[in-house]
Amino acid sequence: MIGKEENKFISFIKKNKFFASRKMGQNFLINENIKKKIVDSLEIKPDDHVLEIGPGFGALTKIVLSQTKNLTVVELDKRLVEFLKQEYKELRIINIDVLKFDFKEFNKDTQYKIISNLPYSISSKIIFKILKYANFSQSVLMVQKEMADRITAKVGTKKYNNFTVLLRITSEIKKLFDVSNNCFFPKPEVDSTVISFERKKDFDFTNFEKLESFLLKCFSQKRKTIFNNLKNYFPKQKIEEVFNKHSIIPTTRPENIKEELYLKMCFDFYDL
């Protein structure tokens, strides 16, 4: 049965001959129960400040606004910006590509929460930007299920990579629930997963870029050993020194090293 909000959505599409943009990764959430479940996961209080990335037709926006008026949305598609302006007169809308959005300056004196159904093609880039620059307390994001599986992958598995390690070291991550592709229009080819994450308080984020760079070196070629990957960037003597200190066998492959050990190695290689 089609609800009131779905009817409004379909009417707008027909009236405006709206076509979802593949380039922008537009798949709009239309399941009312899932919308509520996502927003409830963020545990919004009336005085909370919230940033929503890619609101689309306002699937989550309306529910968030019922819980706090301190909502800012970032939307690139001008067609959707016009729709949101008509629907939510007092909503603060920033019409910009989220990859160009200045997370560092936004609400820099007040922590805020982040909510989003992320575009699949750029979700990892957005997550990196959030972790690097955003002054956020908690984030609830919907990502491609495959990405969620990578984020939560166990050491020694094929999906365990530099992205996995970086997020594990810098943030507390929870896999909340899966979302069927039937909950979207147009229907994507894959299912999604909602995750929650927040920054770890014991990690010094001034070291984020060095850690990110180091992990890229370690996983530059997953089929090669950790030693062979690092020898292109560090002197052999330094590598042997660090490996001996942490009892690392040179023939170990990158996916077989725990995240805690990567952090220790990073500190030693860069003398942090």
Swiss-Prot record:
Transmembrane segments: none annotated. One of its GO terms (molecular function) is 16S rRNA (adenine(1518)-N(6)/adenine(1519)-N(6))-dimethyltransferase activity. InterPro entries: KsgA/Erm, rRNA_Ade_diMease-like_C, rRNA_Ade_Mease_Trfase_CS, rRNA_Ade_methylase_Trfase_N, rRNA_adenine_dimethylase, SAM-dependent_MTases_sf. It is found in: Cytoplasm. It holds the Pfam family RrnaAD. Its EC number is 2.1.1.182. It comes from the Bacteria. The keyword S-adenosyl-L-methionine applies. S-adenosyl-L-methionine binds at N27, L29, G54, E75, D97, N117. Specifically dimethylates two adjacent adenosines (A1518 and A1519) in the loop of a conserved hairpin near the 3'-end of 16S rRNA in the 30S particle. May play a critical role in biogenesis of 30S subunits. Belongs to the class I-like SAM-binding methyltransferase superfamily. rRNA adenine N(6)-methyltransferase family. RsmA subfamily. This is Ribosomal RNA small subunit methyltransferase A. It comes from Malacoplasma penetrans (strain HF-2). The gene is rsmA.
